[in-house]
Amino acid sequence: MSRKSRLKKEIKTCQKKIVEIERRRSRSQSALVQAILLQEEPNDQDVEWFNKYTGEITACRNHMLELKKELESL
């Protein structure tokens, strides 16, 4: 498999992974927004999950950007 096609395939994989993680993060995000709107203290576990998923999304996006730069340089 050529380098370009391998990079394109890996970029698509990253995009799918980001969508999947964002879907998981939305549950804790909803709980956090609800707590804010009700002026309550957010659940610590929801905060931890939100931060965990946000970190994973950021890492995956950064990796995808590196792959795109590499693809453009070919």
List each model region and its residues.
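Compositionally biased intrinsically disordered low-complexity regions
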Residues: 12-16, 35, 69
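Generic alpha-helical secondary structure signal
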Residues: 54-57, 67
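Short, charge/polar-rich alpha-helical segments
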Residues: 1-23, 55
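Intrinsically disordered and other compositionally biased segments
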Residues: 8, 25, 56-58, 62, ...
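Short E/K-rich amphipathic alpha-helical oligomerization segments
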Residues: 17-51
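Long amphipathic alpha-helical coiled-coil segments
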Residues: 34, 61-74
